[in-house]
Design a protein with these regions (language model features):
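Hard-cation-handling environments
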Residues: 1-44, 165-176
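Weak global preference for isoleucine
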Residues: 8, 12-15, 25-26, 84, ...
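Charge-biased, low-complexity intrinsically disordered regions
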Residues: 174, 179-199
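Short, solvent-exposed coil/turn linker segments
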Residues: 1, 132, 180-181
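Feature captures the catalytic cores and cofactor-binding loops of soluble hydro-lyases/lyases
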Residues: 34, 39-172, 193-198
Length: 199
């Protein structure tokens, strides 16, 4: 953030059970020493990393609602471009989950408290498994159970999470290029311009 202190208004993706659509909400968040103080705000920090060697772009956003409340989840199965998505309540678990996805050459990971809670390797293009269907199904069930244990309250937490990056689905989604206002078909900044409170 260009502001050293005070508060800023930011765009947040709100997840609701029953849909893979998100709602854009505007929240006030503190800034300290030029950094957005999102931890403890009720929001997760989300990041999308370009993984095809085309500039190594990273997009950042915030997520709230019926998503997980602790730990972090990371995946390379993230519609439609299938870059790497990670979202978490703290940087340490985000780093752990993200690095594990990279180590597996793709997949889904849930982490909490500095430990991997569940994982599903997807080494074929980062979206497919080379293991028997029964084994994949069991791994997927463990990831889903772990996400629910971290507080995800959605009838299909995996599909909900993996479509946070789908810019064809309303209303606010995240890509490696940044936040996408789907209705307006444009990239929008995290900070809502023209709305800032004083220190």
């Amino acid at each position: 953030m260009e502001s050293d202190s005070g508060t800023v208004m930011v765009r947040v993706m709100e997840i609701k059970d029953g849909s893979t659509k998100t709602k854009e909400i505007i929240m006030e968040m503190p800034v300290r020493d030029g950094f957005l103080k999102w931890e403890g705000s009720g929001c997760l920090l989300a990041a999308v990393f370009e993984r095809y060697g085309k500039g190594q772009a990273v997009g950042y956003g915030l997520v709230t609602g019926d998503c997980h409340k602790r730990g972090a989840v990371a995946t390379s199965y993230a519609h439609d471009c299938h870059n790497i998505l990670v979202a978490g309540a703290n940087p340490a678990d985000m780093k752990l989950a993200l690095n594990r996805v990279i180590e597996m050459q793709g997949g889904m990971v849930a982490a909490d408290g500095g430990r991997i809670q569940a994982e599903l390797p997807l080494p074929v293009g980062g979206i497919l498994s080379d293991r028997p269907a029964k084994e994949v199904g069991a791994g997927l069930a463990r990831v889903r159970e772990a996400m629910t244990g971290l507080g995800y309250r959605h009838y299909n937490p995996i599909m909900s999470f993996c479509t946070l990056t789908l810019p064809a689905s309303p209303a606010l989604k995240l890509t490696d290029k940044g936040l996408i206002d789907v209705k307006a078909c444009k990239i929008v900044p995290l900070k809502v311009e023209g709305q800032r409170t004083q220190p």
